Swiss-Prot record:
Name this polypeptide is given: Acetylglutamate kinase
Organism lineage string: Bacteria, Pseudomonadati, Thermodesulfobacteriota, Desulfuromonadia, Geobacterales
UniProt record, GO biological process: arginine biosynthetic process via ornithine; L-arginine biosynthetic process
Pfam family name, one: AA_kinase
Organism from which the protein derives: Citrifermentans bemidjiense (strain ATCC BAA-1014 / DSM 16622 / JCM 12645 / Bem) (Geobacter bemidjiensis)
Pathway annotation: Amino-acid biosynthesis; L-arginine biosynthesis; N(2)-acetyl-L-ornithine from L-glutamate: step 2/4
Gene that produces this protein: argB
Amino acid sequence: MQQLIEKASTLMEALPYIRRFSGKTIVIKYGGHAMADEKLRKSFALDVILLKYIGINTVVVHGGGPQINETLKRYGIVSEFVKGMRVTDKETMGVVEMVLTGQVNREVVGYINQNGGRAAGLSGKDGDLLICEKLLQEVKSEDGSTETVDIGFVGDVVEVNPAILQALEKGGFIPVIAPVGVGRAGESYNINADVVAGKVAAALNAEKLILLTDVSGVKSKEGELLSSIPLADVPALIDNGTVTGGMIPKVTCCTDALAAGVKKAHIVDGRIEHAILLEIFTNVGIGTEIQA
């Protein structure tokens, strides 16, 4: 009997959050280990479906780095990276687009639908959702000077046209976005999926942006999870070395989204089953929340 009471208490803990977020929009960046593990894939799909059933408009943006690497290797194409960004020539872009839109997107849509949801896949080219310009990287040379490097078809999102997402939401669908954008001349661009999620969240005036990662969240220098970070504290955390390496672009993505009107951003460990529900519907959460 006690176990049943505890289950009821868990449901009641979620009730105020369900009331608060019903009718609102949440954008989720889906990637990392959560995409590779069968149990985590099902957990993710069920979380997203539940959000939709209780009236939360859910938009998914997926990555696909490992799948791209595997396919490029199979084709004998060697990737070069500049400041963590893949140099993407025309041949590489063709493979990237094929993998993201033709393989990964269909897989994500498939396992949401197979578990009882109604997902619809698209890329940033559909409905001119993500308009891009070429992203140029600034690189320091050995003499200390700064050089601008052209890394090919890597895009910087300059415009988001969310009408197609809003139409899908009204139709009861869960939009699943592949991070491929389009230039003014119709050319395809590879875009960082975290950036896409942040830009889409801002365009939809989302209540939350959630980035699923392969770490527990932002940690202090002592290795303890920082469960909540005020937006104003982020620059100091980067300057003093608390936020380092690959976490910097993720945190920056969150702060950019908050500055553009998103209410809260979360960095959550996607290796935990039902991580999305635990972060949204419990009093403590499991990741790092960044709030304005």
